[in-house]
Amino acid sequence: MEKAPAKINLSLDVLHKRDDGYHDVEMVMTTIDLSDRIELQQLPKDEIQIALESRYVPSDERNLAYQAAKLFKKTYQIPNGVRIQIEKNIPVSAGLAGGSTDAAAVLRGLNRLFHVNAPLKDLAKLGSNLGADVAFCVYGKTAIAKGFGDQIEMLPSPPNCWVITARPDIGVSTRTIFERIELQHLQHPDTKKVLEALQKRDFYQICISLGNALEDITFALHPEVNRIKNAMLQAGADGAMMSGSGPTVFGLVQHFSKAQRIYNSMRGFCEDVQLVRILG
């Protein structure tokens, strides 16, 4: 069994648009204790099976976990097939890298199942062909990702704290958000301050340095996401931000009693609210 933890962004910046149409990004990310679970079983025939109970997630080649298995098998010339059982706990299209972390878990799991023993850096390079968050998710923990998300540099973990996630009942297409980017109008986060705060393990400096260049775009399309962020701060979160392209908003709190109060308060705004520890 392979755990596939969700990620949150502590900083997300978009630097420029490349000739291939994609954007170069700079993202500081860490993992939280909200995880999908992946079980892998070797099959004698050359096939890939996906088993999961979710009407929102495809179980064919559109699934990133399927694509990860196909790429791994091709790269390392694996003749056998594999059955991938996915227990979904991370919301879909939520800005928490649910699909990417599943793909990363498949790469790690197949590496062990078939005794390939490839180093994580090789798996991360493979994963970068699947999506911008997959390389980070191969490593997990805390890191800064640059370029298309394929240049990974590990960072110190944030101090222990609680994370409240709140997600409205909408899905946000990352592609749609990136298509609406006007670089000259973006509010760029101070990534350097986030990095300095992580080096010092300064919780409150991390909280006041959070920044996401995509927030204003998502807020314009879905004002309820902005309302959730404001509600999170008004309820007492030390810091709050939208993760990824949204719509999930997270709040950071050091003490459980306060986190519990904020969790209960946010239940009045949306049904999908979680209270978890930071993993980092």
From Swiss-Prot:
Q: Which GO terms describe its molecular function?
A: 4-(cytidine 5'-diphospho)-2-C-methyl-D-erythritol kinase activity; ATP binding
Biological-process GO terms, alphabetical: isopentenyl diphosphate biosynthetic process, methylerythritol 4-phosphate pathway; terpenoid biosynthetic process
Q: Keyword Kinase on this protein?
A: yes
Which InterPro entries did the record assign?
GHMP_kinase_C_dom, GHMP_kinase_C_sf, GHMP_kinase_N_dom, IspE, Ribosomal_Su5_D2-typ_SF, Ribsml_uS5_D2-typ_fold_subgr
What Enzyme Commission number(s) does the record list for this chain?
2.7.1.148
Matching entries from Gene3D superfamilies are given as: 3.30.230.10, GHMP kinase, C-terminal domain
Q: Which UniProt keywords apply?
A: ATP-binding, Isoprene biosynthesis, Kinase, Nucleotide-binding, Transferase
Matches recorded under Pfam families: GHMP_kinases_C (PF08544), GHMP_kinases_N (PF00288)
Q: Residues that bind ATP, according to the entry?
A: P91, V92, S93, A94, G95, L96, A97, G98, G99, S100, T101
Catalytic site positions:
K7, D133
Q: In which pathway does it act?
A: Isoprenoid biosynthesis; isopentenyl diphosphate biosynthesis via DXP pathway; isopentenyl diphosphate from 1-deoxy-D-xylulose 5-phosphate: step 3/6
- Name the domain of life: Bacteria
> Into which EC class is this enzyme placed?
transferase
SUPFAM superfamilies according to UniProt = GHMP Kinase, C-terminal domain (SSF55060), Ribosomal protein S5 domain 2-like (SSF54211)
What does it do? Answer: Catalyzes the phosphorylation of the position 2 hydroxy group of 4-diphosphocytidyl-2C-methyl-D-erythritol.
Q: Which NCBIfam families match?
A: ispE
Name used for this protein in its record: 4-diphosphocytidyl-2-C-methyl-D-erythritol kinase
Source species, please? Oceanobacillus iheyensis (strain DSM 14371 / CIP 107618 / JCM 11309 / KCTC 3954 / HTE831)
